[in-house]
From Swiss-Prot:
Region (Disordered): 1-30
Protein name: Cyclin-B2-4
CDD domains found in the cross-reference section: CYCLIN_AtCycB-like_rpt1, CYCLIN_AtCycB-like_rpt2
Record's keyword annotation contains Endoplasmic reticulum: no
GO MF annotation, one: cyclin-dependent protein serine/threonine kinase regulator activity
SUPFAM superfamilies (alphabetical): Cyclin-like (SSF47954)
Key words, A-Z: Cell cycle, Cell division, Cyclin
Family statement: Belongs to the cyclin family. Cyclin AB subfamily.
Amino acid sequence: MGGSDENRHGVIGPMNRQQGGLRGGKVIPTNGQTRRALSNINKNIIGAPVYPCAVKRPFTEKNGICNKKIPPVPVHRPVTRKFAAQLAENNLQIHKEETKKPDLISNEALDRIITDVEEGDFNEPMFVQHTEAMLEEIDKMEGIEMQDSNDIDAEVEESVMDIDSCDKNNPLSVVEYINDIYCFYKKNECRSCVPPNYMENQHDINERMRGILFDWLIEVHYKFELMEETLYLTINLIDRFLAVHQHIARKKLQLVGVTAMLLACKYEEVSVPVVDDLILISDKAYTRTEILDMEKLMANTLQFNFCLPTPYVFMRRFLKAAQSDKKLELLSFFMIELCLVEYEMLQYTPSQLAASAIYTAQSTLKGYEDWSKTSEFHSGYTEEALLECSRKMVGLHHKAGTGKLTGVHRKYNTSKFGYAARIEPAGFLLL
């Protein structure tokens, strides 16, 4: 270096045996100057940082009083650990600010750059890729959550209750195949139906006489305290017999009714009324022989087929699906017994009559149309499919206490049947 000669190679002189007999060589500087002080060694190192040193400046009154901004004078001080950390932190902040400053590039230059660079040659920074991946994942999660919430809402709205879960430990409920049993009933209920105009083939009786007979049989059934199944089977046997045997005299119509009740009692009841009781209830209009002969004729005509689904079979299942209480149950049976007397209601199947009776009773008690998904599932009928039949039931409810055929109204106007006949009809269903 120009300012120091201490790094230049010296010359080793020859051995001078005369001067003290030195065995080693002596380093002779070329310029004869001695080595500089050690304190200035930093100047001789290439690229070495300059050590700061404190420079004291005198304090002037002018500088202390004046409000003018005086450019700061660089202070040279020894580098301690704390001071070095501050310097490193300042350099880091400056570096961050420089990286944040966008490069000003003209549009033409930018276009050229974008045109020249291919998509596959440019890699996005890792933090950008991670951010995009996180956003995509969040979007997916939000989509899944929205879909799950929609599915949950749909499940809540369209959920069908397991109405047989409470009877799993009851072997008499046959929970394992109860649904198969009712599917079989639905398929075979058409066999228990009769043509809705079969009275046109009768020569001596009509639908009004049929209604009188059924209204009387409902009172007889109530006085004998028979099972509900017996009443519905009695009505079914009479209609099926009259639909096939087309030459029944008017004076024999009551005999057909009494005999049908006897057959139904033998099929359903544990304790069957004796023939003499039936003769007495018919005011001794028929003899024992006539009743037994009609019994044989009816059994042969119907081919001993008494096991067919009636509206009562479906009523029990549909009431369970509707989670009915006693009030709803009594009003539903009141509705459907009104239909038994009416000839025009033969156009509906037993299952449709049962579902319509429950739907009408629910709407009557609640004051609005009500038909749950569970009831729809187990009955197989939507609310729209029941409206026509339900409106006719409301009409029958309106006139139940009027006219000559009031047996059903008197029966359900007692405390035993919860005074169901006194409930106001659901007139809003007629609108």
